[in-house]
Amino acid sequence: MQIKEFIGSTVLDKNANVVGKVDNVDFDTETGKIETIALTLQKNIFTRDELEINFDDIQTIGAYVILNKEIETETEE
């Protein structure tokens, strides 16, 4: 998978809850390994937050990015 295909992918936590979408990828320029991914969390139609995840917290990358941990996101009512 190329980075441009990775950006915009839906991210799920280990309980299959939608966490957000991949917004950016930071990688080590010497090794080429991904270090962190930045997620955009959409609370509602007008509010967005960002979250940074370590690459070690990713279980699977495919149709979805699945994390190996639970992420709690606050929702506004």
Regions found by a protein language model. Give the residues of each.
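Peripheral interaction segments used for macromolecular assembly
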Residues: 1-77
